[in-house]
A protein has these predicted regions:
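Anionic N-terminal interaction surfaces
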Residues: 2-15, 53-121
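IQ-motif-like calmodulin-binding regions
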Residues: 16, 20-24, 195, 200-201
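Short, surface-exposed beta-strand-loop junctions and turns on beta-sheet-rich folds
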Residues: 134-138
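Acidic, Ser/Thr- and proline-rich intrinsically disordered linker/docking segments
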Residues: 141-201
Length: 201
């Protein structure tokens, strides 16, 4: 399957302020020379500012933005008819899968990976139907698993340490004991607490 070059680039890039600092300092030097230079320094300062500004813009434009990467995920969801927003009576949990995935740190410092999971919870009398989609962002493939769980089940959050190139991170999973069902979740989402609250009855 053809890989998405933009997704590949995003997952491989490492955001460092090095070039921003270098080109920003170059612009600052040019401005100082412009105001305090004399003779050829005055004209040379204009060239320094132009070079520094151009380098700064090129360094920034060479990056794949967080919005571009999230846009790829949104397109995959839409192309496969996967709902991003919950309908009435449903809850949708979404999270990046850190375990066994290529992990990167975005421009906004948030950790993201090459695999994205959504789980749709549809509650009815006595049971809950769960439809979980796992997306491989680079190749655009989607797998789907469907489960039916009684509302008497008592789910729990399990945390696992996962080693990445950015150090150790937590992989949180919503687990239904004795079922083999494990759903990656973002525990910062209030919807996770709401899902747990609806079980154990």
């Amino acid at each position: 399957m053809k890989k998405n070059k933009t997704a590949e680039k995003y997952l491989a890039q490492v955001i460092t302020p090095k070039w921003d600092i270098i080109f920003g300092s170059t612009v600052a030097l040019g401005v100082i020379l412009f105001f305090f230079g004399w003779g050829w320094g005055y004209y040379f300062s204009i060239l320094i500012v132009i070079v520094g500004a151009a380098g700064f813009i090129l360094a920034r434009s060479a990056r794949v933005s967080d919005e571009d990467y999230l846009g790829i995920i949104d397109r995959i969801l839409a192309d496969n008819g996967i709902e991003k927003n919950a309908s009435r009576g449903e809850i949708i949990l979404s999270s990046f899968l850190m375990k066994d995935s290529e992990v990167t740190r975005g421009i906004d410092k948030t950790l993201r990976s090459g695999r994205y999971c959504t789980a749709e919870f549809v509650f009815s009398k006595g049971e809950c139907k769960i439809k979980m989609h796992t997306i491989d962002v680079k190749d655009g493939s989607v797998t789907c698993d469907t489960y039916t769980v009684p509302l008497t089940a008592v789910p729990a959050i399990q945390s696992e340490d996962v080693e990445t190139r950015f150090g150790t991170v937590k992989q949180n999973t919503l687990v239904f004991p004795d079922t083999g069902i494990a759903i990656p979740v973002d525990t910062n989402s209030a919807d996770v607490d709401e899902v747990i609250r609806r079980f154990g009855r």
